[in-house]
């Protein structure tokens, strides 16, 4: 399968008081180069995932690096067979990854970074408690062997989970955390360090860097890694897995899930069918019809 689109997942924490001034030039460049995706700007830095041609992504990354605060962004590259985003957004936010706890600053205090090559040894240590900081639907399709699933719906719930399980968390000497690309662990490890935990570690570059770097035969990862774009999930070597999203609840679906009697394209799946009313489903059906009509109109306009 030909992979025409380069995908860049990037973030950089910085003290960026003038972040509002960067919104327009970033959006203008992305639109001029036909780059799509989302970039978040806040006083604490930049975060996002974008996709485009190889040259366009290189130009954007070089432009970002011209900002003195963004000299060394954390970037993971991968490829997609089709454009994994529908539009380009550059948003101004309070946080570039939302934890909702005031005063957490990874520039001041953070866990110890562990390279993918050293990760297996750390998480196989009997004194290490391994925590998946992602959401429950991400954990459901893949994680590291032996990892604890906090069962959270959003990252905002993570601090409360830590506080509830503080007694259990202190039973092991070391705490190791991981997430998709590394940014959530910047905040989660900073948070637990502020609580007084000392031996706190996190996977540098996140799961994506591990799957890119570590051969499958040496890997302690099971399943797939959920990604927040139209690829839905990737596996070792950052290859696409062929999943789709339920457009009603955004749960990842494989071929088997689409055979369920509860599955209806754009309307429902096993994960959300019993959580929605028939009124909800009719609303989703109408939305799905409008989306399909919009696609048809776009296709006809290109043919004229």
UniProtKB/Swiss-Prot annotation:
InterPro entries: Rhodanese-like_dom, Rhodanese-like_dom_sf, TrhO, TRHO_N
CDD domains (UniProt xref): RHOD_YceA
Gene3D superfamilies, per database record: 3.30.70.100, Rhodanese-like domain
Catalyses which reaction(s): uridine(34) in tRNA + AH2 + O2 = 5-hydroxyuridine(34) in tRNA + A + H2O
Any one GO BP annotation for this protein: tRNA modification
A family per Pfam: UPF0176_N
Enzyme Commission numbers on file: 1.14.-.-
Active site (UniProt): 179 (cysteine persulfide intermediate)
Keyword set, alphabetical order: Oxidoreductase, tRNA processing
Entry's Gene Ontology molecular function annotations: oxidoreductase activity, acting on paired donors, with incorporation or reduction of molecular oxygen
Domain (Rhodanese): residue spans on this chain: 124-219
Family to which the UniProt record says this protein belongs: Belongs to the TrhO family.
Function of the protein: Catalyzes oxygen-dependent 5-hydroxyuridine (ho5U) modification at position 34 in tRNAs.
Protein name: tRNA uridine(34) hydroxylase
Lineage: Bacteria, Pseudomonadati, Pseudomonadota, Alphaproteobacteria, Hyphomicrobiales
Gene giving rise to this polypeptide: trhO
């Amino acid at each position: 399968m030909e992979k025409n689109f380069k995908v860049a997942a990037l973030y950089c924490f910085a003290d960026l008081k003038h972040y509002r001034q960067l919104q327009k030039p970033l959006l203008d460049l992305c639109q001029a180069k036909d780059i799509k995706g989302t970039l978040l700007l806040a006083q604490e830095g930049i975060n996002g995932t974008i996709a485009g041609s190889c040259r366009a992504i290189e130009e954007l990354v070089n432009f970002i690096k011209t900002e003195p605060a963004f000299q060394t962004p954390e970037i993971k590259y991968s490829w997609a067979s089709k454009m994994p985003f529908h539009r380009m957004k550059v948003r101004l936010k309070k946080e570039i990854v939302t934890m909702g706890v005031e005063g957490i600053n990874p520039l001041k205090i953070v866990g110890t970074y562990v390279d993918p090559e050293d990760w297996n040894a750390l998480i196989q240590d009997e004194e290490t408690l391994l925590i998946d900081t992602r959401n429950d639907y991400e954990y459901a399709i893949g994680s590291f062997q032996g990892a604890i699933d906090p069962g959270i719906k959003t990252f905002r719930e993570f601090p409360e989970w830590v506080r509830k399980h503080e007694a259990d968390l202190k039973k092991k000497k070391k705490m190791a955390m991981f997430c998709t690309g590394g940014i959530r662990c910047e905040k989660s490890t900073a948070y637990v360090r502020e609580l007084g935990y000392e031996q706190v570690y996190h996977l540098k570059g996140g799961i994506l860097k591990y799957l890119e770097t570590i051969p499958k035969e040496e890997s302690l990862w099971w399943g797939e890694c959920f990604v927040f774009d139209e690829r839905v999930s990737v596996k070792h070597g950052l290859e696409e897995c062929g999943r789709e999203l339920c457009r009603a609840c955004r749960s990842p679906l494989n071929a088997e899930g689409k055979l369920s009697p509860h599955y209806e394209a754009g309307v429902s799946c096993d994960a959300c069918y019993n959580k929605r009313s028939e009124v909800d489903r009719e609303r989703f059906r109408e939305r799905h019809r409008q989306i399909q009509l919009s696609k048809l109109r776009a296709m006809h306009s290109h043919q004229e």
